[in-house]
From Swiss-Prot:
Pfam families: Radical_SAM, RlmN_N. Its EC number is 2.1.1.192. Its main location: cytoplasm. CDD domains: Radical_SAM. This is Dual-specificity RNA methyltransferase RlmN. Keywords: 4Fe-4S, Cytoplasm, Disulfide bond, Iron, Iron-sulfur, Metal-binding, Methyltransferase, rRNA processing, S-adenosyl-L-methionine, Transferase, tRNA processing. It comes from Vibrio cholerae serotype O1 (strain ATCC 39541 / Classical Ogawa 395 / O395). It comes from the Bacteria. Belongs to the radical SAM superfamily. RlmN family.
Length: 373
């Protein structure tokens, strides 16, 4: 019987030190040496770790591995965006690299599919299978960094920002999300600033409450409607945690956070003649008066079979100007990678649906059908 090897990408620094001490009988500083090799040098070969003694290298080869998701397909957009299908087990999740003049952002998935069934999101139409492991979340960053590193001659910018805005709801995978975030921030990991790592949530209040005092990163919230009636129609999670409950915990999180500089990013997808009217803009502006924020408007990105359309430029412009009358900071997200279906709301991957779509989801606490790892 073959014993499965331990994937070292599943450990943050604390977990790796504990594993080295308790399972390998090694001093904790050895764990930090190995961690530096993994994340600073993109190394997955123990034999290349030349400051590690041979005895430990042999022990690591016998018991451990460094295994990130691999790229099963890559698509390149005309604007420089790259979408990778990353193989996790027998399925794919999607990871998107978005280069800009002064930064390069990586959009990372947290689940295989999504159980929340937001009506405007193509990921939701794929159903839900399971949570990603720590190694499968941080492994997307590791693999992407390595892919970019292999293409230095093209002048691609190294990853400077990570956004948890890919497939899935991050706060329904807290067990694996937090260690992955810790590795992103750790000096021995990717060493990113807390202001350059963003978690986006559709409103999992219990998860956001757990984050308070536990991890400090930038926060973006998927609001997408100015009132509970409309939000429940397009985002069923609102039936479990309504807007008032959501914004209350958001205010508490940003009050405890240094990463957010006192403001949360409010994401609002504009759906033609659904939530993009002037009356919706006035209602949204009033709703957010007590929540320090900047508002990011996202014109809808169509996908095959979608019942919604992108609003006209005049409707988008009018919505923005109405919000600005209330002295809100309002931006319109530039669509990137839409020619390869890599834009916001277009990610689908390859998902074996484990949810029963003929039955309504019951948002009782976090009693959503989530297979944990």
């Amino acid at each position: 019987m073959t014993t499965e090897k331990v994937n070292l990408l599943d450990f943050d620094r604390k977990g790796l030190r504990t594993f080295f001490a308790e399972e390998l009988g090694e001093k904790a500083f050895r764990a930090e040496q190995v961690m530096k090799w993994i994340y600073h040098f993109g190394c997955d070969d123990f034999d290349q770790m030349n400051n590690i003694n041979k005895q430990l290298r042999e022990k690591l080869k016998a018991k451990c591995e460094i295994r990130a998701p691999y790229v099963s397909e890559a698509q390149h957009s005309a604007d420089g965006t790259i979408k990778w299908a990353m193989r996790v087990g027998d399925q794919d999740v999607e990871t998107v690299y978005i280069p800009e003049d002064d930064r390069a952002t990586l959009c990372v998935s947290s689940q295989v599919g999504c159980a929340l069934e937001c009506k405007f999101c193509s990921t939701a139409q794929q159903g839900f299978n399971r949570n990603l492991r720590v190694s499968e979340i941080i492994g997307q960053v590791w693999r992407a960094a390595r892919e970019i590193g292999l293409e230095k001659e093209t002048g691609r910018r190294p990853i400077t920002n990570v956004v948890m805005m890919g497939m899935g709801e991050p706060l329904l995978n807290m067990k694996n999300l937090i260690p992955a975030l810790e590795i992103m921030l750790d000096d021995l990991g990717f060493g990113l600033s807390k202001r350059r790592v963003t978690v986006s949530t559709s409103g999992v209040v219990s998860g956001l409450e757990q984050m308070i005092g536990q991890i400090d990163v930038a926060l973006a919230i998927s609001l997408h409607a100015p009132n509970d009636k409309l939000r429940s129609e397009i985002m069923p999670i609102n039936d479990r945690w309504n807007i008032e409950a959501f914004l209350e915990v958001v205010r508490r999180y940003i009050a405890s956070s240094n990463a957010n500089r006192g403001k949360v990013t409010v994401e609002y997808v504009l759906l033609d003649h659904v939530n993009d009217g002037t009356e919706h803009a006035h209602e949204l502006a009033e709703l957010l008066k007590r929540t320090p924020c900047k508002i990011n408007l996202i014109p809808f990105n169509p996908y095959p079979g979608s019942p919604y359309k992108k609003p006209s430029n005049s409707r988008i412009d009018r919505f923005q100007k109405t919000l600005m009358q209330y002295e809100h900071t309002v931006t319109i997200r530039k669509t990137r990678g839409d020619d390869i279906d890599a834009a916001c709301g277009q990610l689908v991957g390859d998902v074996i649906d484990r949810t029963k779509r003929t039955k309504a989801k019951q948002f009782d606490g976090q009693a959503i059908p989530v297979k944990t790892l």
